[in-house]
Design a protein with these regions (language model features):
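N-terminal subdomain of nucleotide-sugar transferases
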Residues: 2-148, 452, 474-497
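Short alpha-helical donor nucleotide-sugar binding micro-motif in glycosyltransferases
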Residues: 172, 351-352, 359-364
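A short, active-site helix/loop in glycosyltransferases that binds the activated sugar's phosphate group
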Residues: 228, 236-265, 270-274, 336
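Nucleotide-activated donor-binding/catalytic signature segment of Leloir-type glycosyltransferases, i.e.
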Residues: 335-356
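Aromatic "clamp/platform" in nucleotide-sugar-dependent glycosyltransferases that forms part
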Residues: 372
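Short hydrophobic beta-strand element within catalytic cores of glycosyltransferases
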Residues: 389-392
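A short, well-ordered alpha-helix in the C-terminal region of glycosyltransferases
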Residues: 421, 435-449
């Protein structure tokens, strides 16, 4: 595959179809490998792939991004229509998830729990290998295996595990997976990769935590480059990479961490029944507002970590003496935040779940998200599904949830770190009940389009099938020299006739 910095393409009679929607890249010229590079400005193009014309890769996103790639024999894509028998028959899927989606507080907790649930409802056999703490005895019939873990050196509350003990290798081998799916980055993904190679099984990696962005906040900035090298090693070894947002896809491409035709979007999903305006509750509002339910109430839900830029909210609240703020969630930064907000009317509820969490979302006036490092921002989806207007930083995966054409309709975005811009978006909502209700209603309607079952079906049927196709192609290319040699050593009898 060859990419040129400036493309002038002939018109095409037909357009190539893809299950992915468009990204609009605006980045400098990048090299994806020795044979290809990403142009500094890629245009939205539709063309039928031929021998000499480019292939247009599309990734599902509300932001328009198109990767225009010249096709050669080494960079083909799977056929758009796959054998229905292979996509509908039950599959055996081994998931390697670190930290545990059952106990660790993070954005992907709901994603993986719903994913496992939906896979089981589709009739698939699922094995989950994860860190040992908090692993339940049963979860929708999936086979659960805990691997002994240790705390991350610079983030003690994050458990890590290689998951490469003889016991786990034996368990996975007996399970006979059709495909292995590992969360990335981390330590366990290395174990998953080794096991996939040992068992000759395709491996999909899904990228969930943008570690290079977090590193300067927790440890030494010089570790960013080595971290990107590790990510590149992992994802170039994977048969397919799943990302939660277009922004993360752009970052991986910019770092040459994966080939463009092997990056696919894991569609967003939200449980619109659990996160619903009907859960609005006066008692919960009294609790969140510190006994003053008549005051404007701002809600933030999520893990309380230093990388979430939550100190920015102190500057916001200093300008809103009449408003109240509630932090729903827990994390290593909680004590610092409590000291920071000492003497104010801020409320820290700790972890909430189930109906209490649904009530917390639905009982606020505005949801605020200052984080600049979200790979997607599932709490933003949950807030919008609850009918809560959102004000969030225009960074990370958030613009994929509230794209430019939807700003002011389904939510508001502000320039990261810009207090004036944030206040300009926040104040009208706090002062105008009708505006809050209108934005909340439109946000709810938008979120009703996204369903976990549909997102899971797309991964299972389309993306897993694509990974298997890439794996088989790579395997056949690897075996080709040996097949050629075998023909020379053991010539076919028919050829001698």
């Amino acid at each position: 595959m060859i990419l040129s910095p400036s493309l002038s393409l002939p018109s095409c009679a037909s357009s190539c179809s893809s299950s992915q929607s468009q990204f609009n890249f605006k980045s400098k010229s990048l090299s994806l490998n020795r044979k290809r590079s990403v142009p500094h400005k890629l245009r939205n193009l539709k063309c039928a792939p031929t021998e000499n014309t480019p292939v247009t890769r599309k990734l599902d996103s509300q932001s328009n991004m198109t990767i225009s790639l010249h096709r050669d024999e080494d960079e083909e894509n799977p056929p758009p229509l796959l054998d229905s028998e292979t996509t509908t028959r039950p599959r055996r899927i081994a998931l390697f998830v670190e930290p545990s989606p059952f106990s660790y507080v993070s954005g992907y907790k709901n994603r993986f729990q719903n994913f496992i649930k939906c896979l089981r409802e589709m009739g698939d056999e699922v094995m989950v290998v994860t860190t040992h703490e908090g692993v339940p005895e049963e979860f929708y019939g999936a086979k659960l295996i805990g691997s002994r873990s240790f705390p991350c050196p610079w983030y003690q509350k994050v458990p890590l595990s290689l998951a490469l003990s003889p016991r786990i290798i034996s368990e996975v081998a007996r399970f006979k997976p059709d495909i292995i799916h590992a969360s990335s980055p981390g330590i366990m993904v290395f174990g998953a990769l080794i096991i996939a190679k040992l068992l000759c099984v395709p491996i999909v990696m899904s990228y969930h935590t943008h570690v290079p962005v977090y590193i300067p906040r927790y440890t030494f900035a010089w570790l960013v480059k080595p971290m990107w090298m590790i990510i590149k090693f992992l994802h170039t070894a994977a048969d397919l990479t799943l990302v939660p947002s277009a922004a993360i896809a752009r970052d991986l491409l910019a770092a040459q961490a994966a080939a463009a035709n092997k990056i696919r979007l894991w569609n967003k999903g939200v449980d619109s029944d659990s996160f619903n305006p009907r859960f609005r509750c006066h008692e919960m509002r009294v609790r969140l507002s510190n006994g003053e339910p008549e005051k404007p109430l701002i809600v933030h839900v999520g893990r309380l970590g230093v990388e979430k830029s939550l100190d920015f909210l102190k500057s916001v609240m200093d300008r809103l003496p009449e408003a109240r703020i509630a932090f729903v969630g827990d994390g290593p930064y909680r004590q610092d935040l409590e000291k920071m907000f000492a003497g104010t009317r801020a409320v820290f509820t700790g972890m909430l779940g189930g109906e209490e969490l649904s009530q917390a979302y639905a009982s606020g006036d505005v949801f605020i998200m200052p984080s600049e490092s979200e790979t997607l921002g599932l709490v933003v989806l949950e807030a919008m599904s609850s009918g809560l207007p959102v004000v969030a930083a225009r960074a990370g995966g958030i613009p994929d949830i509230i794209p430019a054409e939807q700003e002011g309709k389904t939510g508001y975005l502000y320039t990261p770190g810009d207090i004036e811009d944030c206040m300009a978006q926040l104040m009208p909502l706090l002062n105008d009940r009708e505006l809050r209700e209108r934005i909340g209603k439109l946000a709810r309607e938008e979120m009703e389009k996204y369903d976990w079952k549909a997102a899971t079906k797309k991964i299972r049927n389309e993306q897993y099938s694509a990974a298997i196709w890439f794996w088989r192609k790579k395997r056949s290319q690897f075996l080709r020299p040996f097949q050629w040699l075998a023909k020379r050593i053991f010539p076919s009898p028919e050829l001698n006739l």
